[in-house]
Amino acid sequence: MKNTTLCYLEKDGALLMLHRVKKQNDVNAGKWVGVGGHFEEGESPYDCAVREIFEETGLVPAALSYRGVVTFVSDEWETEQMHLFTSDDFLGDDRFPRYTGGEEKETDCIEGNLAWVEKSLVPTLPLWEGDKIFLSLLAENEPFFSLKLVYTGDALVSAIKNGLPL
């Protein structure tokens, strides 16, 4: 099982989102996601989140909230356990453009284009169905949760939160 982190940075009613449009053979191609990535040897979830945020954005979180663990099971890729964080307290140049729909601006992230997206606009973006579930839980300030998302191909076939089907 692979371990990853994902973090949603928040500022002025918007989330920093990454539109995955630059990498070849990307399972997330065309989707909007938070920032994060794979663990390196010896990293804790917190260490990984801080490193990935800095590598992808140049920002350094001053504080992170550990919000949940999401387990992805699929018939097409390795099972993944994703550690989910949020932060509204970070240091650095948060110069990324605001995305309001339509054409987006190119940014220097090698994985895609970064943009601040109004929270109300996020559900209208191309997202994984499971991401819509945990983004909703984050928006509702759900206490720490365990979420299991099962996919057949690109289709979400099962979602279980804290042991109970959704």
Placement of each model-derived feature along the sequence:
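A conserved beta-turn-beta hairpin within the catalytic core of GNAT-like acetyltransferases
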Residues: 26-30, 78
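Acidic/histidine-enriched, glycine/proline-rich intrinsically disordered or flexible terminal extensions
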Residues: 144-166
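Flexible, glycine-rich phosphate/dinucleotide-binding loops
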Residues: 16, 24-25, 73, 91
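Unchanged
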Residues: 39-62, 72-138, 159-166
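Conserved N-terminal beta-strand and adjoining loop/helix that marks the start
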Residues: 1-17, 35-40
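N-terminal first-folded block
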Residues: 23-27, 41
